[in-house]
């Protein structure tokens, strides 16, 4: 498994599962979104995101903006990006 060129990211928001999979060397990072966070019980997006970042400070974490218009998405993305050195911001694309 060490010669796999694909990086495996877990697409989850449950803190218990993030803690579990963060210990797995095969998992290279995490990605989540506002919908998954809400289902996991998040009430405050920033506070919940910071909990995720505290669990896995050394792996990439992709967080998604939840605004609907360009200016708000850009503003949110810039703010979210300051939450940690390992943060990657996702911008949803729709037709």
Regions found by a protein language model. Give the residues of each.
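Active-site beta->alpha loop and helix N-cap motifs at the rims of alpha/beta catalytic domains
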Residues: 3-19, 23-27, 31-95
């Amino acid at each position: 498994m060490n010669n796999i060129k694909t990086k495996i990211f877990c697409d989850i928001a449950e803190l218990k599962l993030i803690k579990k999979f963060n210990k797995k060397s095969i998992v290279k990072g995490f990605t989540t979104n506002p919908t998954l966070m809400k289902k996991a019980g998040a009430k405050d997006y920033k506070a919940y995101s910071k909990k995720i970042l505290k669990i896995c400070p050394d792996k990439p974490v992709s967080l998604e903006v939840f605004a609907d218009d360009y200016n708000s998405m850009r503003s949110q993305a810039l703010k979210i990006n300051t939450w940690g050195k390992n943060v990657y911001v996702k911008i949803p694309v729709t037709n």
